[in-house]
Swiss-Prot record:
Belongs to the cytochrome c oxidase subunit 2 family. This is Cytochrome c oxidase subunit 2. It is an enzyme of class 7 (translocase). The gene is MT-CO2. Gene3D superfamilies: 1.10.287.90, Cupredoxins - blue copper proteins (2.60.40.420). Cu cation A1 binds at residues 161, 196, 200, 207. Its main location: mitochondrion. It is a multi-pass membrane protein.
Length: 227
C-alpha cells in the first residue's frame, strides 16, 4: 500500500498492475528522451552565434518532425491497446461478486452463494484501534481468494461512484442503471486498500475499500461459516 512521501506508484499485486507499471516506465522513458532532445536543441539555439537569414523553409526537417512523432505515438498506442484488451478480458472467473455504491458506503454480494451479502462502512476515527489507518478501515472487509480470477460487477444506487484499488490496477465507474464489470487477481495474500475515486457528495472521502486476499482453503472455510 501507499506510504508517507511516496513518489512512485504502489507495488503491483496483480498481473494487470505489473503491465501498467511496465507501460508507465516505458512511456516515461520515451518522454524523458524527447524532453532531453528538445532542451538540448533549445540550448543550442540560445547559445550559438550562427544564423541562417536566407533560409525560408526546410521541407526535409518539417517532414521528419511530422512523421517521427506520429510513429512514436502509434507505438505507444499499440502498447496501451494491448493492456486495455487484457483489462476487459473475462476468462472463466472462479467467483463473481456484485458491488453497489451508495452515499456513502459500499454493499457487496457474493452471487455464487445464497444470502451472502453485507454493507461496508468506514470506521470512524474515534473508534479506530492502535495500528489501524484513518479513513481507510471498514467494519466489513471483502474476503476473496488469492491467485483466482474474480469478476466484479459494479453499479450504483444513487449517484456516480468509482470503485478503485490502486495496487491491483483497478478503477471502474459505478453508474446508476448500468452494470460495469472488471476482473481482479491478487498474486499474494494481504490487505489492499482503495477509495471511491469519483466525487459523489459531501462524504465522498469517507468511502474506503478494503480487500483481504486469503488462500483458497481459508476462503472456503469463511464462506461456509457466513452462509
Amino acid at each position: 500500500m501507499a506510504y508517507p512521501f511516496q513518489l512512485g506508484l504502489q507495488d503491483a499485486t496483480s498481473p494487470i498492475m505489473e503491465e501498467l507499471l511496465h507501460f508507465h516506465d516505458h512511456t516515461l522513458m520515451i518522454v524523458f528522451l524527447i524532453s532531453s532532445l528538445v532542451l538540448y536543441i533549445i540550448s543550442l539555439m540560445l547559445t550559438t552565434k550562427l544564423t541562417h537569414t536566407s533560409t525560408m523553409d526546410a521541407q526535409e526537417v518539417e517532414t521528419v518532425w511530422t512523421i517521427l512523432p506520429a510513429i512514436i505515438l502509434i507505438l505507444i498506442a499499440l502498447l496501451s491497446l494491448r493492456i486495455l484488451y487484457m483489462m476487459d478480458e473475462i476468462n472463466n472467473p472462479f467467483l463473481t461478486m456484485k458491488t453497489m455504491g451508495h452515499q456513502w458506503y459500499w454493499s457487496y454480494e457474493y452471487t455464487d452463494y445464497e444470502d451472502l451479502n453485507f454493507d461496508s462502512y468506514m470506521i470512524p476515527t474515534q473508534e479506530l484501534k492502535p495500528g489501524e489507518l484513518r479513513l481507510l478501515e471498514v467494519d466489513n472487509r471483502v474476503i476473496l481468494p488469492m491467485e483466482m480470477t474474480v469478476r466484479m460487477l459494479i453499479s450504483s444506487e444513487d449517484v456516480l461512484h468509482s470503485w478503485a484499488v490502486p495496487s491491483l490496477g483497478l478503477k471502474t465507474d459505478a453508474i446508476p442503471g448500468r452494470l460495469n464489470q472488471t476482473t481482479l487477481m491478487a498474486m499474494r495474500p494481504g490487505l489492499y486498500y482503495g477509495q471511491c475515486s469519483e466525487i459523489c457528495g459531501s462524504n465522498h472521502s469517507f468511502m474506503p475499500i478494503v480487500l483481504e486476499m486469503v488462500p483458497l482453503s481459508y476462503f472456503e472455510t469463511w464462506s461456509a461459516l457466513m452462509v
